[in-house]
C-alpha cells in the first residue's frame, strides 16, 4: 500500500467515527435525561459493567464519573459470577454496556441487579436485545457499521459509547455543581492537581504572619519583617483591618527619598491598599497576580479584609504549579 493510500484509509476510518458521533449527537432524547436523573438521585455507587472492548470502555467511564463527583466502580461480569456480585447494593445504580445486548455474563449481572431492585441503564446497539429488556432506560448506540473493513472490530461503536459516557459524566458534573476546588481534592498529584491547588493549601498562618499596626514605629516594623523572613509585613488599623503593606522595596524607596526611620511610623512608609488574595482562590491565580504586579508576596485576607496569612512566590514555585 502506497503512503497516499495508507493515509486515505486512515482518514476514512476517522470519517466513519465522526459520522458515528454525529448520529449520537442527533439521537439524544428524553432517555438520556431519564438516565442522568437516575444517576443524579443514586444514593449509592454507580456500577459499570461490560465485557471485552465494552468492558474497557465501561472501566474508563467509571473512572471519569468517580473523578468528577459521582462515586463509581467497575464490576467485571466474569468476576461477578464468582463472588464479586456482592459489590452490588440496593442503593446503587447500574450501567451495563453491550453492543450486541446479548453478552451472557452481563445478563447474569442484570438479573441479580433486578432482584435487588437496582435501576439499570442499558447502553446497546440493539434495542430489541435481552439487555434492553432488562433495562429501565435504554441508550442506543446508533452505529450502522464499524470502521473495520470486515465490520467486526469494535471501532465506531466503542468511540460512540465512550463519548456517550463522557456526556453522562459531564452532565452530572454540571448538575451537581462540581467545582474546580472539588476537582483539586480528587487530583492532588500530577499537573492537573497542582494547577488546581488553593491558596489555603500553601499559605503561612498564625504566628508566621508578619503584622504591625499603622502607628508602630519603623524600628519595630523592620524587626517584624526580618524576624518572619518574608521581606514584608502587613499593616493593620486599630480594628485589625488591612490598610497597607511594607516591603523591602518600600524601605529602599523611603531611604532613596532621603527619609529617616527616626520617629517614623509604619503608616508613613507603607503602600496603601495592597494586592491581596482569598484563601479559597487558586494558587495559580495568586502567582499570576504576583507576576502582573511585579511583587513577590500577597497578604491573604478573609471576607472582613483582615489579614489571616501570607503567601510568598517561593511557596508557589516550590509547589510546581506551572
Swiss-Prot record:
Protein origin, superkingdom: Bacteria
The protein's UniProt keywords, in alphabetical order, are:
CBS domain, Isomerase, Repeat
What this protein is called in its record is Uncharacterized phosphosugar isomerase aq_1546
- GO biological process annotation, one example: carbohydrate derivative metabolic process
User: Per its UniProt record, what Pfam families does this chain match?
Assistant: CBS (PF00571), SIS (PF01380)
Family as reported in the entry's similarity comment: Belongs to the SIS family. GutQ/KpsF subfamily.
The record's InterPro entries line, in alphabetical order, gives:
CBS_dom, CBS_dom_sf, GutQ/KpsF_isomerases, KdsD/KpsF-type, SIS_dom, SIS_dom_sf, SIS_Kpsf
Q: Which species is this record about?
A: Aquifex aeolicus (strain VF5)
All copies of the SIS domain together span 35-178
Q: Does the keyword Membrane apply?
A: no
